[in-house]
Amino acid sequence: RQMCIRDSCHSVQGTAKMLAEYLDVKPESMSYWCVGINHMAWYLQLKSDGVDMYPKLKKIAESKKTIAEASAKEGHYHRHVGDKFNDGVRFEIMKYFGYFNSESPFHMSEYVPYFRKTPEMIDEWHVSIRWWLEHELSNDEYYEELKKQVESEEDIPMPQGEEYAPNVIHAVLTGKLFRANLNVMNTGLITSFPHDCCVEVPCFADSEGIHPCYIGELPEGPAGLNLTNINVHRLMAKAAVTKKYQYIYEAIQLDPLTAAMC
């Protein structure tokens, strides 16, 4: 039996909230059209109350000082890394490729060969902190907290988060339309990419299911950067299916981070 899989991530909506903080606008005023691949999607349109925010965002990118000032307004990563957070990587990518990217500067720096060539560069671009490792190592503490909540007679706090899944499920069950950026197979949705890759595109969910949006061609620069990672994805998928190590060797050689380190 063939399975229909739709994968969700929080980077698109999470970054949109960060951009609202950088731009000094309300998060609920933001609208965007973000497409690409998971952890490397591009905000092709970025608006607040219908006004294009890219001129203001590109103004921030003009100097390290303005980038640092904007980064200081961000709330999520500051809870993990404090004042060391700086979004210079993504502003630099936008400077050359024209669009802001959906993934954090820490992780985005691992998808390209530009920022991790030397320890000095890693420090310069503020991507030395491995906060996600610390987050993973705290799972035992989190598990104990969950046990206490389950064993307690008090109500468990369940504030609405930013993850797409609950709203997508609600849309399918009730028919109330909801739009989410989801990861789906590229059935001709992005014509710049191979048909056998996974893409991240806006999708509409309702009682009839999940409906990915047709995108067409991406701008050549952002598409080219996506393809450097799509090549790795496809080879690793082949390695998993065929159990052939050759595909793993080829994927490692093509990985942009290999170019940064070798």
Model-derived features with residue positions:
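Alpha-helical scaffold elements adjacent to nucleotide-binding pockets in ATP/GTP-utilizing enzyme cores
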Residues: 15-19
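Long, compositionally biased stretches enriched for glycine and/or charged residues
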Residues: 20-262
